[in-house]
Curated annotation (Swiss-Prot):
EC class name: hydrolase
Pfam families, sorted: LexA_DNA_bind, Peptidase_S24
Enzyme Commission number(s) of this protein: 3.4.21.88
UniProt lineage: Bacteria, Bacillati, Bacillota, Bacilli, Bacillales
Quaternary data: Homodimer.
Site (Cleavage): A93, G94
Active site: S129 (for autocatalytic cleavage activity), K167 (for autocatalytic cleavage activity)
KW DNA damage (keyword) present: yes
Family stated for the protein in its record: Belongs to the peptidase S24 family.
Name this protein carries in UniProt: LexA repressor
Native source organism of the sequence: Geobacillus kaustophilus (strain HTA426)
DNA-binding residue intervals: 28-48
A GO MF label: serine-type endopeptidase activity
SUPFAM superfamilies on file: LexA/Signal peptidase, Winged helix' DNA-binding domain
Summary of the function given for this chain in its UniProt record: Represses a number of genes involved in the response to DNA damage (SOS response), including recA and lexA. In the presence of single-stranded DNA, RecA interacts with LexA causing an autocatalytic cleavage which disrupts the DNA-binding part of LexA, leading to derepression of the SOS regulon and eventually DNA repair.
Amino acid sequence: MTKLSKRQQQILEFIKQEVKTKGYPPSVREIGEAVGLASSSTVHGHLARLESKGYIRRDPTKPRAIEILDNDMAKEREKEEIISVPIIGKVTAGQPITAVENIEGYFPLPKRLAAGEEQLFMLEVMGDSMIEAGILDGDYVIVRQQSSANNGDIVVAMTEDNEATVKRFFKEKDHIRLQPENAHLEPIIVRDCTILGKVIGVYRLFD
């Protein structure tokens, strides 16, 4: 097993104790209070490392879904290199997309599925504007950070109104068309927009 830092060991032991005594894992806030960490983002970072090392497994859509892995499962996960992809809860104009205050958590992604990309983030999709591209309400898109796009790329873009949106990108004569993949919706026409990244994958939970 990959060696844990002192703080990671403290967090792991606290989670084990809470599950043993209460029957369910602690929240991020409770973990922070127990080990003396005021920042929830710092706790998320430690949990991501525990997950990448194969000690726990989390469900990013549920606040308390932390599962302690047994040794066999942990050893199996240790064989495969995992990267921690930040899940962005909000997009703020003028800030880097992965600024700490924007991060809600981390998602463990096998490196082989990242196509060699390092600068990734994930964003929850709200609405049905991209359903004809197979991106549904509640899906998480996996996004490669980049500031430019080719016509036809599905991107995360920040519009002039400082709204982040997932659309297909088209640069036309004197404007940019952000095209939904839904026949019932009209495109967004803007003079300019900021490209935050290109969508390279989708993560979905089935009921």
